[in-house]
Amino acid sequence: MKLVDEAEIEVFAGNGGNGCIGFRREKFIPLGGPDGGDGGAGGSVYIRADENLNTLVDFRHDRIFKAQRGENGMGRQAYGKGGEDLTITVPVGTVIINVATDEIIGDLTQHGDRLLVAQGGRGGLGNMHFKSSTNRSPRQALPGEPGEERTLKLELKLLADVGLLGFPNAGKSTLIRAVSAATPKVADYPFTTLYPNLGVVKVENYRSFVIADIPGLIEGAADGAGLGAQFLRHLQRTRLLLHLVDISPMEGGVEGISPVEQVRAIERELEKHDPELLQKPRWLVLNKADLMFEDEAKAAAEQIVAELGWKEPWFLVSALGREGTFPIMSRIMAFFDRQKEDELEARNAL
């Protein structure tokens, strides 16, 4: 499941209808008073979260959205019909930013969340409102007010349970293919993943969780280098991070960077982008063990863990051969179960 996770759109609320200049004209009442009605209000623009959507790809082509204008007022004090509101649907997890001010105006995290993004203009007053003791036949009415116009940036933050992070070619796409039905592109060159991919991991008893494959990070990603910078935000809503590292000597690490330095480099990028990401539970997955003899792979893994002073869980796997991958998924499910129990106990203690 590939995602387009950024889009920029323009929204135009409807203008209000104009007020009417009219006079009552009936048989036997040739000089009736003013009876011009008010214009209808313009339609507003809303954005609503829909759990059935998972990408912003539709906004690549449809970028301009206009609500209906209000109808003009009419004689006999008839009000103009209000313009219909326009509702734009986006995936759950979409953040809405006002481009003019760079202000976040909404964060739609639940199905059905709805946000007003452009208010329709009010209808103009008809001349019936301007009658006075000195002006019995006013020829004055007000035009409708213009509707709001905004340029909005939409950013999709994935609502995944687990986020995969690591350098390019660490094997993230291979792992997500191994443990879910997702089929991201896999090849032997960096930056194979150009968009985030989601996969649903099914564990025993029909339970499941969502895992996200984030494009590879490199040194300087938080400052815009490589492809990873724009995707770091997807990690913010995950409950657990799996940090994949290529330990195979045949690969030479990544561009000659040792596994230990790979880990530390990405930790620096997380720190730059959002220090809170380093506070999330993060497990170490040492991948490509199939490219080494078993005892060599185990010794290399233990050395890496020791050099890092790693205290969290760690695993030695071959994502390509699916060796050691499913025990990790079961362990993750058990971890989430404990999280839920702890949250329930905390609520009951209040």
Swiss-Prot record:
Pfam annotation, one family: GTP1_OBG
Known cofactor(s): Mg(2+)
Keyword Cytoplasm (UniProt): yes
OBG-type G domain residues: 160-337
Keywords on record: Cytoplasm, GTP-binding, Hydrolase, Magnesium, Metal-binding, Nucleotide-binding
Record-listed Mg(2+) binding positions: 173, 193
GO cellular component terms given for this protein: cytoplasm
CDD domains, per the entry: Obg
Stored HAMAP family: GTPase_Obg
Similarity section: Belongs to the TRAFAC class OBG-HflX-like GTPase superfamily. OBG GTPase family.
Record function comment: An essential GTPase which binds GTP, GDP and possibly (p)ppGpp with moderate affinity, with high nucleotide exchange rates and a fairly low GTP hydrolysis rate. Plays a role in control of the cell cycle, stress response, ribosome biogenesis and in those bacteria that undergo differentiation, in morphogenesis control.
Name assigned to this protein: GTPase Obg
Organism in which the protein naturally occurs: Stenotrophomonas maltophilia (strain R551-3)
Lineage, uppermost ranks: Bacteria, Pseudomonadati, Pseudomonadota, Gammaproteobacteria, Lysobacterales
